[in-house]
Amino acid sequence: IGSSGLADRCEDTVYFGDGTRAVVLRSNGGTTLCPPTARDGVPISTTIKLNEYITTHTYGGPGSYKISMTDPNRNAGVINLPNSVNQVFYIESYLVISTFSGPNSSPILSFPPIDKGCVGHCFYHNPGAYDLDGDSLSYELTDCRGTGGIPIAGYSYPATGGGGTYNINSISGTLSWCVPQLQGEYNLAFIIKEWRKNADGEYKLVGYILRDLQVDVGTCLNDNPVIQPISDTCVLAGTVISKTVRATDPDGDVITLSANGGPFGVTAPIATFASSPGISPVTGIFQWNTVCAHIRKAPYPVTIKAIDSDPSISLVDFKTFNITVVAPPPTSLTATPLGTFIKLRWNKPSCHQITGNKIEKYCVYRKADCNPWNHAPCETGVPAYTGFVLVGCTSSMNDTTLIDTNGGAGLAQGTNYSYLVVAVFTDNAESYASNQVCVQLKRDVPVLINVDVKTTSTSTGSIFVRWIKPLLNTSTALDTVALPGPYEMKLSYYNGFAASTYTTIYTVTKTYFAGINQLADTTFTQTGLNTSDLPYTYKIDFYANGTFIGSAQKASSVFLK
């Protein structure tokens, strides 16, 4: 606020949006102006003071609440706000308390709105907002509000001149006014919206903050400093990220760099930014030692501010970049053929012991070739373009096995299959993909090779079925030591292409595998069928000592209708 004593509040009133309010004492600064309990605030320039008011309020239950504060009055003579001296200053935060969304913290605004503008030069402001819960933030311009939060009649966005712009970047939050036309005071406002994805995958509004700022525009011969572009980055949890920030000034002024954002407000270790004011060009070093507790789906925004030292009016520039902290992958993935199924097993990732945003499950992906795929630095999970498809997910962090049954249909003999596994966290963040394994099914179950209609009839039709026996004494054969006999094959069928109940029509049992291997006849002809009107589907199940080994992939008779 300005330094005017009339506007200096030792206490102020906050309205909680549930029909209640509280008078809150100022809580920062010394005790000279507001004895005996309130404090004085902290001057941050000759004309600006930082005042903090802190209180606690408990809501009665779920709902949506507007938390607001009103303060009379705005300065007189604000150019884009008529009769400004009689318009109250109003700000609000919108809070959604919901059973689906869980605990919620409002975004933190780390850069105060204290910069000035200059006629003919772009004015920039960025609040340096970040959200500790990892909620997504978006930004939009709005009108300044008055009594009751109603937009002030006659308010207008500031003039920009022909071809100029006044906007806010909806992602980075940088407000740009290019360029101010007239000296004087202006009031600007924007909203920072907070979004969270629900169980249906839809983003829902869980809160917003209204920032209202005063900008004093003067005249100067200064030019804005320029921060060089900074690329977004993904980093494996547990490693150190370091970024060098560079800024220049067209006038050769001394530049001061500062940084704010998510990495400065997280659980330790927090980020550091080292830079000293210097004549253009100037550099700063951002560094952050990430740990497992920093893993989350949403990136961490970091906003850099550069301000020059022009003696008339200092101008600024902002740049925002994002850091995504990615979880390490599950390790030691193995794939073991089991009949026409494949059993996957892996070890937990190194970050499995964290609480809060913890591992909820693992998801397994498959494709039908052995071509390798390696993720890019910012590719988490398994993208669709890789050709991998989701096989299934486990139910917990401790469940580190999954059997791929291909939906119960079994996998194809003679096909190479590749697998990857990914850890999925509470906020749906995905780890990097695991090591890729490739495997081919063993020939340890029979394989159907013929299902042919021999006779077409509505009642006396027949179908010929033929299969290949399981192999012995090859690298992909049945392990008879691990799976001793007796051995049994069951041929079953059902009417149609999809059914849950099979009828067994042929069984053969042998004490030793040699008996299976020596079978001369591996065919069966089923009669008494309606092959004119119905298709028939067949499968062969194979057992060792009563243990189900697997099934031949199902096959159906040709049926034209």
Predicted regions, residues:
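Recognizes extended acidic, P/S/T-rich segments that occur
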Residues: I44-T46, P277-G278, K358-A412, A482-D533
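Extracellular interdomain linkers/hinges and stalk-like, low-complexity segments
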Residues: S84-G134, A199-D251, S312-F341
